[in-house]
Amino acid sequence: NKELTIRELISLIESKSINLRPPYQRNFIWTPKDQRLLIDSIYKGYPLPNFFILKNKDGKYEMVDGQQRATTIYKYYNNEFKDNRKKFFKEYAPDFFLDYRLNIVEIGNFDSSKGESKEVRSLCDERK
């Protein structure tokens, strides 16, 4: 296990070093209420469930579990919705949010072209 800050996650997303929607992932389905509750949890300092990511042989990552949360965080960072206080991200001093630490479980060196990542996704689903 390791930790990433939200700032580091955003950097991975923007550099296209992590794929939030590999082919086996469902579409983004969280409601606005779900999204606001997640952001509220971050501002309150509550721990979030682990994010599971695969590190492919090419050094890039795939989000196996945590796509809804990661997408919500990125959408909020880009001021696509307001939080429970009816404010956009840009209306706050950013450091508290960006320095929030996410727990990451990294599963290494898979070859997604062989479908191995889908097997890992199945295992993650079984543990829920």
Regions found by a protein language model. Name each.
Residues 1-9, 18-128:
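Basic- and aromatic-enriched surface patches that contact anionic nucleotides/nucleic acids
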